[in-house]
Amino acid sequence: MGMIQYLQVDQYGAFISKHSERLIVVKGKEKLIQAPLIHLESVLISNHGVSISSDAIQECTERGIPIYFISHNGAPYASLYSAGLTGTVITRRAQYEALQTIQGLRLVLSIGIGKMQNQSTLLKYMSKYRKGTDPTLFQELRLLSTEILDHVIEMEKITQRPEYQSGSLRIADVREEILGIEGRAAQKYWRGVKQILPERYGFPGRVRKGAKDPINSALNYGYGILYGQIERSLVLAGLDPFAGFLHVDRPGKPSLTLDFIEEFRPVAVDRVIFGMANKNMPFELDGEGLLTRETRLIIAEKITERLESTVPFEGKQYPLRNIMQMQARHVATFLRGEKETYTPLQIRW
């Protein structure tokens, strides 16, 4: 029996139960998977028609093993955690108060800057493979990478305003401006991505909901997997994933998760999907325009490998999954006022 740390179940009709010290996945009379609980770190249910017993849920929550639910197109719709993972009162009070103080704005700006820097870096990284084969495309990608950094400067200028320096500026005062800056950077990023990807995929540009093309479908599914890891990191750091800053609070909307995920999208998902595409991964779709089960499993495997890969961070090498947890704790300490700044993850390839 191999060691399973991240259990994914996506077969219609599958049933997850607990037996002794293991989770057992069966479909009818066929035993599909046995996962020893001692090694298990998370459970991902990624299709409809999958059932799980109350005993399995209880055992997972008692052991601190989160259970995530995403649809077959990658849209997350539920998570189960231990009732004890609700964070400290001090951390959550500081988080709620930060929405009305300069602290929340400082966090939003840092995350936004980190996201754009990573987008710029990824375009630059992808361009180097075109230097000899397509010099014109190489120059175009380099230009777009530089233009994204111009938007970083635009974001940084907000911190030079007198009202920011005095501490009186609030997120609500500049929310639309920040979203506009990020949107203009995203336009350049996806314009570059479209030129990087093989034409046979027919990438139309970024489509979030209702995507029917293979690249957007793969990205959305990958983001759904990443979403669960991000939410888990925030909960373990004592933060409320539903109380964000840039994304407006709405019932059932995990706005802090949506804020925090931004600096990791290019690093954890985009690079993986673009790399797979440039190696001619078929990203097969079914008759309804959705990713096939086999394609979803391959994407999940590649995203998991990426999360387990090490990258430089704070002078050492850490698995990307661990860095997410470290960064979530940095967010918590920053909001509590124990750190003067929050430094986003910035990848150098």
Question: Predicted segment positions?
Answer:
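Switch/connector loops and helix/strand junctions flanking conserved nucleotide-binding motifs
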Residues: 52-54, 76-80
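Short hydrophobic alpha-helical runs that function as membrane-insertion/retention elements
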Residues: 43-45, 65-71
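Short, acidic/turn-prone active-site loops that include or flank metal/cofactor-
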Residues: 49, 72-75
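Extracellular/luminal Protease-associated
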Residues: 37-51
